[in-house]
Amino acid sequence: MDGTVTPSPTTTAMPPVSALDAGTPTLPPEAPLAMPEQNLREGSLQVRHQRTSPPGIGVRRFYLIGGTFATTAIAVWVMLSVLWPDGISVLEGCLLGLFVLLFAWIAMSFASAVAGFVTVVARAGRKLGIDPEQPLPTLRSRTALLMPTYNEDPRRLLAGLQAIYESVAETGQLEHFDFFVLSDTTREHIGRAEELVYNELCDRVDGHGRIFYRRRADNAARKAGNVADWVRRFGGSYPQMLILDADSVMTGDTIVRLVAGMENNPDVGLIQTLPAVVNGQTLFARMQQFGGRVYGPIIAFGVAWWHGAESNYWGHNAIIRTQAFADHAGLPSLRGRKPFGGHVLSHDFVEAALMRRGGWAMHMVPYLQGSYEEGPPTLTDLLIRDRRWCQGNLQHAKVVSAKGLHWISRMHMLIGIGHYFTAPMWGLLMLIGIGIPLAGGGIDLAGDLPFSPARYWHGSSQGNAIWIFICTMFVLLAPKLLGYIALLLNPRELRACGGAFRAAVSILLETVLAALMAPVVMYLQSRGVFEVLAGKDSGWDAQVRDDGKLSWPALFRSYGGLTVFGLFMGAVAYAVSPALAAWMGPVIVGMALSIPVVALTSLRRTGMALRRAGIFCIPEELDPPKVLVRASELRRAAALEPSLI
């Protein structure tokens, strides 16, 4: 499944492009803005300490790094007590090295999550004068809302834009905003459909002269090039631009407050919101959006707490100062061939780093609600997107050493790179954990006691190996636990998530399903890393937005090999020892059952049945904001229209 939109057998005849009313302008007068390509080999950090940086930011970062180091040091000391008595072999040295890196990885996430939990419970972390509980500010400047699109269903796309447009109009400040649909569509029939639906939208909301449409003839540099083209042609008319994704929905209230935050803080270059994932209907989408709603704030508030004025950019649902972006975020083409060379794929991290190098503050405001997106409907769709992100993040290895970057910006990129390398590292850790007892004790099929890695590790460490396992699992699962505690302390949110019992059941079920899918994700992420290192490009396809519809042949093509491999591993492990098969059970079961698990979680009826039972519920379903209700109404109505594609 490549996620692209395919022609329908019942399509409506489309008029030629020239049939658009020539008297109705689709673009405003151009206001060019220079956007030079940045030099990664030259440059210096313009401002080291930002005015809007929170007090004690150095202490916060010391806590994060010091806490990570201290927690990891304790775990390594215990691990050494397991390995040291008989000396450390080559395999044990490899195990120790992997353990240090992986435990430090999860320890940093744990330390950040603890900070996020305290911030959420204390209702702290508000900054830039953006307070959603205060009256709506009056704006003074113009802002462009940009919605890039690439081979998307135009009716669905513009239904979301219409909901945003109407929500902004309800604030009484529509005159401060223009809306742009920036098309990079390559399929001609979809391009013609975009123009027709755009015209219908403008007629419907009287948006001519305020809603604009532009389709590039050459979609060079993908989304980054799409936005850069707009900046170079029209950016001079708009002090701010708010970047949307094709599935983004934002309330007018939130948009106005973001613009006011930029107007009142002239040294801020970017403000990133925390988009809540909504509208999930398949089991997979619903478990993802529940996890994002319950654990997501803990994680987001944590990183915002120590990011300070060096926050990251996620590519959408964020407002950017146009002049700052033009001056500092022109992306160069990286030297070499794909996948590491060429256009920057994960452009958002790099744009944020370059803007911070240029002296602009970058902030995240996770407390500001009213920002929404949709998640992939199936694990397959997630992994297709993840493969593209893998290539983009690994490509940052060519950018992380650029001159003049703030060290936190470099850290963002290293974390992004590390996210994908942890998958093969976890796999190696498990294999070495089995290999050490095999090398140490061998396999005696005729012995009184069958081979058991668990017995080996327990017997050789006086129980310390068990403590390492318990501590590792606690650190891994702590964000879920902290998210649940924070939910219990917020009666309104708790009620909207189904109450304490149903929320606990949801967390437990999400954890079990995530554990079943973890071996699949680990394998495919590891394969993605090796493919990128081998030079295989990910390409660029449109994303699937609606319910996933995975056929059994497609499932067997995607996961058949992994299923056979899991069954083979299970048979070999059982032949050696049932205890070994039990030790490897979580990985074997996840691989062997990958087809039915992906099929089950891809079903809409399963997800909706759990919703009726109060499982995986989120506040936006109990009391949906008006903009989401309107977007859903418009999309349902659009689905009833004759297909244009």
Curated annotation (Swiss-Prot):
It is a multi-pass membrane protein. GO terms for biological process: glucan biosynthetic process. It is found in: Cell inner membrane. Its main location: membrane. InterPro entries: Glucans_biosynth_gluTrFase_H, Glyco_trans_2-like, Glycosyltr_2/OpgH_subfam, Nucleotide-diphossugar_trans. Keywords: Cell inner membrane, Cell membrane, Glycosyltransferase, Membrane, Transferase, Transmembrane, Transmembrane helix. Involved in the biosynthesis of osmoregulated periplasmic glucans (OPGs). Pathway: Glycan metabolism; osmoregulated periplasmic glucan (OPG) biosynthesis. This is Glucans biosynthesis glucosyltransferase H. GO terms for molecular function: hexosyltransferase activity. Belongs to the glycosyltransferase 2 family. OpgH subfamily. The chain crosses the membrane at residues 64-84, 98-118, 423-443, 465-485, 504-524, 559-579, 580-600. It comes from the Bacteria. Residues 1-13 have a biased composition (Polar residues). Its EC number is 2.4.1.-. Residues 1-32 are annotated as: Disordered. Pfam families: Glyco_trans_2_3. GO terms for cellular component: plasma membrane. The gene is opgH.
